[in-house]
């Protein structure tokens, strides 16, 4: 049985080093898809690079934890910027959901303005769209716009609550991450998905070249290791040998 594998590189637009890494992993590796931060400091550079790589499917990386929002968000920003205090607000059930709804729509329109088309799918920076308070907003929006959504089903209490016409992969894995990146780890992710009987799988990744922005990230040099693994010819062969076909959210 042929299975669909979506290898999605997060953080397109974060920095030039991140952008170049994603393009390299698409052109000479197994990355088939990426998600862009429309408020990223290098988003214009990402748009420019993407024009020369039409095979790269591009979705939107909804941002609520970094940089400046596109709309006024007094309930979520501090000194005009977004940050990781969103976790505290979520725990206190104090998220400004109306502001978040408006910001999602604004980032979506900005994506279309930048890339000239709809995103293939939605996900989010630091997985904030999986917060119980935010997920229904994003799921409803994706279904209404006819675009797919990254869904990590582990935090979900009931798949039956999803909109009937919402598209997603059957499986999602964030396990290809950390200090022990290797081909063996990537293939283990595939094998685990196969054992669960999933016919489609998205694997998240963050391939990049290190620049000054990436140096400031808590997740820095493993991004280079990811790039090495994702451009390995032997990995591409092993994926095909396991019955996986590389594709994107266009295929779900």
Curated annotation (Swiss-Prot):
EC number assigned by the record: 3.5.1.105
Cofactor(s) needed for function: Mg(2+)
Statement: the UniProt record of this protein carries the keyword Membrane: no
Ranges annotated as spanning the membrane: none
Cellular compartment(s): Cytoplasm
Lineage top rank: taxon: Bacteria
Any one GO BP annotation for this protein: chitin catabolic process
Gene Ontology MF terms in the entry: chitin disaccharide deacetylase activity; deacetylase activity; metal ion binding
Keyword S-adenosyl-L-methionine: no
Pathway: Glycan degradation; chitin degradation
Catalysed reaction equations from the record: N,N'-diacetylchitobiose + H2O = N-acetyl-beta-D-glucosaminyl-(1->4)-D-glucosamine + acetate; diacetylchitobiose-6'-phosphate + H2O = N'-monoacetylchitobiose-6'-phosphate + acetate
Keywords: Carbohydrate metabolism, Chitin degradation, Cytoplasm, Hydrolase, Magnesium, Metal-binding, Polysaccharide degradation
GO cellular component: cytoplasm
Positions annotated to bind Mg(2+): 61, 125
Record's subunit section: Homodimer.
Chain's role: Involved in the degradation of chitin. ChbG is essential for growth on the acetylated chitooligosaccharides chitobiose and chitotriose but is dispensable for growth on cellobiose and chitosan dimer, the deacetylated form of chitobiose. Deacetylation of chitobiose-6-P and chitotriose-6-P is necessary for both the activation of the chb promoter by the regulatory protein ChbR and the hydrolysis of phosphorylated beta-glucosides by the phospho-beta-glucosidase ChbF.
Family: Belongs to the YdjC deacetylase family. ChbG subfamily.
Protein name, as recorded: Chitooligosaccharide deacetylase
Organism whose genome encodes this protein: Escherichia coli O6:H1 (strain CFT073 / ATCC 700928 / UPEC)
Gene symbol of the encoding locus: chbG
């Amino acid at each position: 049985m042929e299975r669909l594998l979506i290898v999605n590189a997060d953080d397109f637009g974060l920095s030039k080093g991140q952008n170049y890494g994603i393009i390299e992993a698409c052109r000479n590796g197994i990355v088939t898809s990426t998600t862009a931060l429309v408020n990223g400091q290098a988003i214009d550079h990402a748009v420019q690079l993407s024009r020369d790589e039409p095979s790269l499917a591009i979705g939107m990386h909804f941002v609520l934890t970094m940089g400046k929002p596109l709309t006024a968000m007094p309930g979520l920003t501090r000194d005009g910027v977004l940050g990781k205090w969103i976790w505290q607000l979520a725990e206190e059930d104090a998220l400004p959901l109306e502001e978040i709804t408006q910001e999602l729509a604004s980032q979506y329109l900005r994506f279309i303005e930048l890339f000239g088309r709809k995103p293939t799918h939605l996900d989010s920076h630091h997985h904030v769209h999986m917060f119980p308070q935010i997920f229904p907003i994003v799921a409803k929006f994706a279904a209404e716009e006819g675009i797919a959504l990254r869904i990590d089903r582990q935090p979900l209490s009931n798949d039956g609550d999803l909109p009937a016409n919402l598209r997603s992969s059957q499986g999602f894995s964030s396990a290809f991450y950390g200090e022990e990146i290797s081909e063996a780890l990537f293939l283990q992710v595939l094998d685990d998905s196969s054992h669960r009987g999933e016919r489609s799988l998205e694997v998240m990744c963050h391939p990049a070249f290190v620049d000054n922005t990436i140096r400031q990230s808590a997740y820095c040099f493993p991004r280079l290791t990811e790039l090495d693994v994702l451009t390995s010819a032997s990995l591409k062969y092993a994926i095909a040998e396991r019955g996986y076909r590389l594709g994107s959210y266009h295929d779900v």
